[in-house]
Amino acid sequence: TKTEGSFLAEGGGVR
């Protein structure tokens, strides 16, 4: 989820 960065953490974590 938050592996990529903070932006994914906000979006929900696509990865």
From Swiss-Prot:
Top-rank taxon, per record: Eukaryota
Coiled coil is among the record's keywords: yes
Free-text description of this protein's post-translational modifications in UniProt: Conversion of fibrinogen to fibrin is triggered by thrombin, which cleaves fibrinopeptides A and B from alpha and beta chains, and thus exposes the N-terminal polymerization sites responsible for the formation of the soft clot. The soft clot is converted into the hard clot by factor XIIIA which catalyzes the epsilon-(gamma-glutamyl)lysine cross-linking between gamma chains (stronger) and between alpha chains (weaker) of different monomers.
GO cellular component annotations of the record: extracellular region
Single biological process term from Gene Ontology: adaptive immune response
Keywords for the protein's UniProt record, in alphabetical order: Adaptive immunity, Blood coagulation, Coiled coil, Disulfide bond, Hemostasis, Immunity, Innate immunity, Secreted
Compartments it resides in: Secreted
Subunit structure: Heterohexamer; disulfide linked. Contains 2 sets of 3 non-identical chains (alpha, beta and gamma). The 2 heterotrimers are in head to head conformation with the N-termini in a small central domain.
Domain observations: A long coiled coil structure formed by 3 polypeptide chains connects the central nodule to the C-terminal domains (distal nodules). The long C-terminal ends of the alpha chains fold back, contributing a fourth strand to the coiled coil structure.
Function: Cleaved by the protease thrombin to yield monomers which, together with fibrinogen beta (FGB) and fibrinogen gamma (FGG), polymerize to form an insoluble fibrin matrix. Fibrin has a major function in hemostasis as one of the primary components of blood clots. In addition, functions during the early stages of wound repair to stabilize the lesion and guide cell migration during re-epithelialization. Was originally thought to be essential for platelet aggregation, based on in vitro studies using anticoagulated blood.
Name of this protein: Fibrinogen alpha chain
Gene: FGA
